[in-house]
Amino acid sequence: MVASARGLRTLHSAHSSISALPASTVPRLQLAVSRCYATTTSPDCPITNSSNSSNSTPTLTPKQRITAFKDKLNAGPSFSDFVSGGGASNDSVPLDPTEAYSLKTALVGPPGKKKQIIRLPSWLKTPIPDSPNFRRIKSDLRGLNLHTVCEEARCPNISDCWGGSSKSAATATIMLMGDTCTRGCRFCSVKTSRTPPPLDPHEPENTAEALSRWGLGYVVMTSVDRDDLADGGARHVAETVRKVKQKAPNILLECLTGDYAGDLEMVALVATSGLDVFAHNVETVEALTPFVRDRRATFQQSLRVLKAAKEAKPELITKTSIMLGLGETEAQLWETLKALRAVDVDVVTFGQYMRPTKRHMAVHEYVRPDVFDSWKERALEMGFLYCASGPLVRSSYKAGEAFIENVLKKRRGEGADGSGGSSTRREDVERLVAGGVVR
């Protein structure tokens, strides 16, 4: 009590002393009476000193800056503006060809450092994957520790291939030997390393289990390049093919392989392992190959691989794919198709190159859909059994698989519906391509 009384007397004395001072010497203190977190400053919200609030930008607290940033995001374009069917435009209204094929540009980047980029054309926009089949396939892949090129290569068709309305309509391309490649092609987003993880000895069995579980009629398997292995992984691929055929003997199997460093014996080993379609991509024309693919991959080596596969098993369907939009010329494409026909390649596909990330080579041009249609007609006229050609077509795109499945079933002596029928000669297959009737 005595201490409290002394404290009160001290405070009273200090107050009396300050009150006796002249007004000019008494310090003036401005106290903030409230806290505001709005993104706009109110006149009665003293965030800053009133002496300079009229001629300077208010200083925002960290929480206010976060709120302001969120408001800007909310006021900007929504996610639907970046996928097909989104935004305020009506996709059902037909466009004039000039307007439909015109490429629009946009400025992106921070103030003072904005760059002009070409926006993705409308014909290259795809929906976001979200379907029961998509979730089921993804769950099975994770449970069995398997990888797909659909995910690793960021394929734009993943929602279409994985999201089929039924098991027979859904397709996934299994990627063997891990998710890390020893090569670094300038167009590919698959991870790369000189020393990738060792092969999974359980992968052949797990792959066979997954494919038999899905109940698909046509399956594509691809693989990374493994130059760190003596055989390039050819024996691992061949074993996987045999395991799949044991668990699902009626399944039609396509393998998209590497070049095995030019070892044609390994190519023959895979070609005769029991698969139905041997695919190896030349990717681009010969003149652009050194700038597009890894230095260990050459155009002539790819031709030798395709030729060796056909020689090892003449009834095998061979297939390759070419990307457009890299700067190739019409004359170069003609020469490429001639070279492919010279080694008896049966199927060719054309697709638009789409830059996966800023670290990869830039797109030279977005090729119009009518140009893809033109190249399809030319390829069929040259004698290819089938040609899938379009901006979103990829080497394992299921539109091509449906036709190849029909051809293979007829060669086996089945009808297109599996009911049975006479075997198909090459002339019958060509008649199928032309839309005729096979007798």
Curated annotation (Swiss-Prot):
Record keywords, A-Z: 4Fe-4S, Iron, Iron-sulfur, Metal-binding, Mitochondrion, S-adenosyl-L-methionine, Transferase, Transit peptide
EC number in record: 2.8.1.8
Radical SAM core domain boundaries: 164-385
Reactions catalysed according to its record: [[Fe-S] cluster scaffold protein carrying a second [4Fe-4S](2+) cluster] + N(6)-octanoyl-L-lysyl-[protein] + 2 oxidized [2Fe-2S]-[ferredoxin] + 2 S-adenosyl-L-methionine + 4 H(+) = [[Fe-S] cluster scaffold protein] + N(6)-[(R)-dihydrolipoyl]-L-lysyl-[protein] + 4 Fe(3+) + 2 hydrogen sulfide + 2 5'-deoxyadenosine + 2 L-methionine + 2 reduced [2Fe-2S]-[ferredoxin]
PROSITE patterns given in the database record: RADICAL_SAM
One family name in Pfam for this protein: LIAS_N
Transit peptide residue numbers: 1-37
Binding of [4Fe-4S] cluster 2, residues: C181, C185, C188
Compartments (UniProt record): Mitochondrion
GO terms assigned for molecular function: 4 iron, 4 sulfur cluster binding; lipoate synthase activity; metal ion binding
GO cellular component, one term: mitochondrion
Pathway noted in the entry: Protein modification; protein lipoylation via endogenous pathway; protein N(6)-(lipoyl)lysine from octanoyl-[acyl-carrier-protein]: step 2/2
Co-factor binding comment: Binds 2 [4Fe-4S] clusters per subunit. One cluster is coordinated with 3 cysteines and an exchangeable S-adenosyl-L-methionine.
NCBIfam families registered for this protein in UniProt: lipA, PRK05481.1, PRK12928.1
Protein's name in the database: Lipoyl synthase, mitochondrial
Native source organism of the sequence: Paracoccidioides lutzii (strain ATCC MYA-826 / Pb01)
High-level lineage: Eukaryota, Fungi, Dikarya, Ascomycota, Pezizomycotina
